Amino acid sequence: MASIGFQLRSSGLALVVALGLAVPAGAVDTAGQRAAITRSLDAQYSRIDALYKDIHAHPELGFQETRTAAKLAAEMRALGYEVTEGVGRTGIVAITKNGPGPTIMVRTDLDALPLPEKTGLPYASKATQIWRGKETPVMHACGHDIHMAVWVAVAKIMLDLKDQWSGTLMFIGQPAEEGGGGAKAMVADGLFTRFPKPDYGFALHVGPG
């Protein structure tokens, strides 16, 4: 199985490279950009790893992601993004503008699953929440904890490289992906009317291996 560190790094690199294809820039120095991305990842890796472990240890079910959303909102505000919380109940939207150009949406999912964790990890979840009327163990069994950590890392990388692109970045945290409903709730709450309508949208999903 691929290590968490490898998944964080490789997913972050892949997403930033994909974003680079969508935003206008001057002459493209691919090798130079990859080196800059790697430097940014290396500089923030210990912080992102700690964020991942914190999120993993404190999972929350769909539309109950209050701690998770607040944690990510604080991270994005600290980076300088303009953040709106409570979009679609527990969703968040974080925006930064960097001159003229397309609006790029980057999405992560926020919720966990109603399952007991049996990994034995030192940061394993001991959380429980109400699911279908019963107190139930909860864990991040589908990689959303990694998705969120990568999402924050990419937000920082794009700021570090802002002299190499132009446009608007719109980072969204979607609640209730498991079982559905979260995306519709955000759209119904004005995701594409209260905020810039994206020209492109990106997301990722890690694999088990």
Give the residues covered by each predicted segment.
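Hydrophobic alpha-helical segments, especially transmembrane helices
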Residues: L8-S10, K53, D145-M148, V206
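Bacterial N-terminal signal peptides that target proteins for export
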Residues: M1-L13
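Bacterial N-terminal signal peptides
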Residues: S10-P24
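A generic structural signal for short, non-catalytic loop/turn and secondary-structure boundary residues
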Residues: S10-A14, G99, K197-D199
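Acidic/His- and Gly-rich active-site-bordering loop/insert found
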Residues: V28-H140, I146-G167
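Histidine/acidic-residue-rich, glycine-tolerant segments that coordinate divalent metal ions
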Residues: T128-M139, D145-I146, D163-G209
